[in-house]
Amino acid sequence: MIVDLNLVDKHVMVIGGGSEGARKIRGLLGQNCKITVISNRLNRYLKSLEKQGKIEIVKTKLNDASILDSYKNQFLILAATNNKTLNRKIVEKGRSMGSFVYAADDPQFSDFSYTSIINIEGILQVAISTYGKSPIMARKIRIKLERILYRIIKK
């Protein structure tokens, strides 16, 4: 089942400030949600988003998921660290708090999977899912299908 969540004014936490966390944040920015990033290291892109006031950053090193105790009202929690064990602890803790959770390194353990989205000028939105099993295949299908749909809509 593919669901399009309304994240307006919802609290979303991304744990991990590397390339995977940044990729997930890029997709969240247009949703008008309140994004908090927790990480001890951040890439330049995330630092620039913080300067623009688009995200809040809590710079800290995590060894476990106990920091979630201070953020109980998170609608969505994305675990995107480079530590599979920590990501699993974050997902388990977040789930116990009633949040939707996602582990970037283990979509099968997550409450949802990311789809490959085609959005054509606010006219059409198509989601392609492999149920988290093959994001690369979903991306290839999206690229081919996007070209076809653009040609149809532009006629």
Can you annotate each of these PLM segments?
Residues 18-20, 84-85, 132:
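Residue-level detector of alpha-helix initiation sites
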Residues 63-73:
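Short amphipathic alpha-helix with an adjacent loop that forms part of the alpha/beta core around
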Residues 55-61:
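Conserved SAM-binding strand-loop segment of SAM-dependent methyltransferases
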Residues 76-81, 87-114:
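ADP-ribose/adenylate-binding Rossmann-like module
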Residues 6, 118-155:
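Adenosine-phosphate binding glycine-rich loop
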Residues 1-50:
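Hydrophobic, well-ordered beta-alpha structural blocks that scaffold small-molecule cofactor pockets
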Residues 35, 57, 100-101:
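Hydrophobic beta-strand scaffold residues
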Residues 53, 71-76:
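Short acidic/histidine-rich motifs immediately flanking catalytic phosphotransfer sites
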